[in-house]
């Protein structure tokens, strides 16, 4: 939100809202929107679909819609989009400390290898990457993700490990901001990998 208001805000907002709430069969922007709206996540329907990747994009978009709705005084919509934007937590798997695909029955996909998908090989739930390329892809709730991971120290250590083990791959957009995530935490900006 940069405060730009020199256009028809209501029409623009309604178009954005429509793309976020239209059922999947009719929705070219969010083809798997039915499950997303009803379950809060996109389940893995086929071995190499992009369910987690799609959902993460929706969460980020919904957070942007929350911000816009809130600025326009649309409290009910703001509440809806904020709640939806926090759905990334469904995918967090404590066993691996990463995001992990979820099956239609709500259980985690198994067997799971968070490294599957390196070098753009097919990966269940992730587009052109693996779980490590997407686990920190929650730019709208970095501190919330840190809490989910067990706190700031665990978050920082896990993020550092991504660099130390060579899991960081700037060739794919989801982890392109990883080097800067350290700066969200007081006293850690010096660890930013720039």
Question: Over which residues does each language-model region extend?
Answer:
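Active-site core of glycosidic bond-cleaving carbohydrate-active enzymes
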Residues: 3-86, 90-191
């Amino acid at each position: 939100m940069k405060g730009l208001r020199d256009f028809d805000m209501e029409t623009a907002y309604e178009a954005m809202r429509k793309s976020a709430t239209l059922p999947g069969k009719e929705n070219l922007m969010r083809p798997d929107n039915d499950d997303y709206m009803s379950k809060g996540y996109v389940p893995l329907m086929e071995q190499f679909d992009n369910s987690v990747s799609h959902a993460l994009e929706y969460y980020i978009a919904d957070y942007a819609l929350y911000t816009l709705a809130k600025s326009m005084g649309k409290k009910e919509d703001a509440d809806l989009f904020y709640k939806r934007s926090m759905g990334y937590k469904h995918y967090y798997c404590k066993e691996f400390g990463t995001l992990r695909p979820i099956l239609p029955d709500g259980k985690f996909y198994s067997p799971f290898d968070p490294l599957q998908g390196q070098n753009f090989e097919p990966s269940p739930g992730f587009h052109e990457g693996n779980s490590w390329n997407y686990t920190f892809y929650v730019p709208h709730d970095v501190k919330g993700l840190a809490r989910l991971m067990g706190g700031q120290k665990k978050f920082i250590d896990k993020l550092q490990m991504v660099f130390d083990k060579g899991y960081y791959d700037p060739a794919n957009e989801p982890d392109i901001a990883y080097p800067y995530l350290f700066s969200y935490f007081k006293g850690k900006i010096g660890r930013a990998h720039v």
